[in-house]
Every structure is written in C-alpha cells, then in structure tokens.
C-alpha cells in the first residue's frame, strides 16, 4: 500500500496521528507576508483625528481605517486606481485570532460577491491582482481573508482555525457590508476548498465553486485510501453531500498536487453539483490560464444561477 512497510502500517493504524498533525504536515506553507496595513487618519474635530500608529503586522487588532501597503513580492499588476478599490480591515475569529480581510469592489452594483478562500503558499498581498482581474471579468466583487498564520493574521495554521477563520470572514462580510447569503458565492481553491466545503455544508448561499479540491488529507497522502478514518483531516468527501447550494467543481486532468480523481469523487458525491469543468492538460496552479476557466465561470454566474432562482 503506497510503498509502506508492515511496521509503518501498524504504526499508522494502531497509533494513528491526530487530524491536526496530518493537516500541518500536508497543507500549510504560509509565505513571508507580502503586505502590511497602514493606518488612515480618522475624520474628527477640525477635519483630523488620531489614527493607530505604525503599520499593522503582528500586533493585536486595533479599530480604525487601514490601507494596504504591498511589498515587491506581491507583484501587483495594476495601478493606483485599482489599488484604491481595495478595502482592508481586521476581524477576530471565535478562536481569538486576528484575521485580515480584503474587499475588492470590482463592479459597482454587482449582483454577487465572491467569498474567496485562497490556496496554500500565498497571502492576500499576492492574491489581490488576481482578485481585481477575476472580479472584473466575471462581474462580481471579491471578498477574501488570510488564514491564521498567513499574512498579518495571527495564530498558527490548523484545521480548526481554518473553520473559525472562514466563519469570521462570513460574519464580517454579512454584517459589515450587509450582504445576504443569497448574494454570496463561496469559492475555495486547493486547501481553500476545506473551509469552503465546511461553511457551505452549514449555510445556504448563492453558489459554491470548488477549484482543484481535495477529498481528504489521508487520500492526498495515501491515494489508495478508500474510507475516511477518524484521524483523517480535511474530510471534504464526508461533507460535500450536505451542501444545498449549486456546486461547480473545477479540476485539471494533469493535477500533480491533488489528483484529478479527487475532483471526480467529489462530483459523484455531491447531489447539488452542476456540469463540472475538467480542464484537459491543466495542472494544479495553471487552470486560470485556460480560456474555458473564465467561460465556465461566466456561464455559471450569469446564466445558470439566475435560471435556478426563477
């Protein structure tokens, strides 16, 4: 079985690791932060007010208005006009971690806002160019957040924190911007499909997009795994059937990180799945470069979702 010796198999099944250890070994590679939050002056008597001093990197969350400062490694592809459409703030999760959030106003009066849970080795600074481009092309605003231990979010990455982090983002999006669930599309990419599936299994929303999803942590590490063990991490395969919103699954047939079979298995298990997008020849990190990616998203959002609402 996957090249494991008898002694290794005995160790695995007689003294199984906890899900948190599996998750930490498989999933989390937070980069060095590519951004900080810089305070903006608050309006006050005489037209000026006190703002929090210094950039926000790792200190406790403070009230106030913030602007994002990107490092060169963020490689922002747009100009100041687009940067000014990005609003950033910090919220707190139920596990007491500070969670950095980003709201990108791509389209005035957009019908939908995408709550985007990004992939593994990136943070909000590296993703914001993609968010500007994606939102503009599919006609949606984009809301995203950094997981605990990513970017300027505090704490450390863990499976439990992933679930608390997306809960905090969901609540912030709903309360801060007054956006109702039927106007929110949950979008998860790679490891981001884990919090996305968990949230979507508990709350109804406009739709769900699973981009290069995994079935579970054990199935990534040991591809011959056929059942979900109690010590498995990220058990998307056990939760996807509970989603009551339309689900679009996208996967590359040559994915070298999370095998294409994961996307197929989730599609077969998901009763609310719509026509999937299997991108022939695409790997784990290049699906966005194929023309059918945007074409399928546009059709899903502009044609299929409205028809399901009528």
UniProtKB/Swiss-Prot annotation:
Tissue expr: Expressed in brain (at protein level). Expressed in hippocampal neurons.
EC class (word): hydrolase
Database matches in InterPro entries: AB_hydrolase_fold, Hydrolase_4
UniProt topology in membrane: Lipid-anchor
Intrachain S-S bonds: none
GO molecular function terms listed in the Swiss-Prot or TrEMBL record: palmitoyl-(protein) hydrolase activity
GO biological process: negative regulation of NLRP3 inflammasome complex assembly; negative regulation of protein localization to microtubule; positive regulation of protein localization to endosome; protein depalmitoylation; protein localization to membrane; regulation of postsynapse organization
Location in the cell: Cell membrane; Recycling endosome membrane; Cell projection, Dendritic spine; Postsynaptic density membrane
Modified residues (Phosphoserine): 307
EC number per UniProt: 3.1.2.22
Record key words, sorted: Cell membrane, Cell projection, Endosome, Hydrolase, Lipoprotein, Membrane, Palmitate, Phosphoprotein, Postsynaptic cell membrane, Synapse
Main subcellular location: membrane
Positions of the catalytic residues: 190, 255, 284
Pfam families hit by this protein: Hydrolase_4 (PF12146)
CC per GO annotation: dendritic spine; endosome membrane; glutamatergic synapse; nuclear speck; plasma membrane; postsynaptic density; postsynaptic density membrane; postsynaptic recycling endosome membrane
Segments of this protein annotated with the region Disordered: 38-61
PTM notes: Palmitoylated on cysteine residues located in a cysteine cluster at the N-terminus which promotes membrane localization. Palmitoylation is required for post-synaptic localization and for depalmitoylating activity towards DLG4/PSD95.
Catalysed reactions listed for this entry: S-hexadecanoyl-L-cysteinyl-[protein] + H2O = L-cysteinyl-[protein] + hexadecanoate + H(+)
Functional note: Hydrolyzes fatty acids from S-acylated cysteine residues in proteins. Has depalmitoylating activity towards NRAS. Has depalmitoylating activity towards DLG4/PSD95. May have depalmitoylating activity towards MAP6.
The family this protein is said to belong to: Belongs to the AB hydrolase superfamily. ABHD17 family.
The protein, known as: Alpha/beta hydrolase domain-containing protein 17A
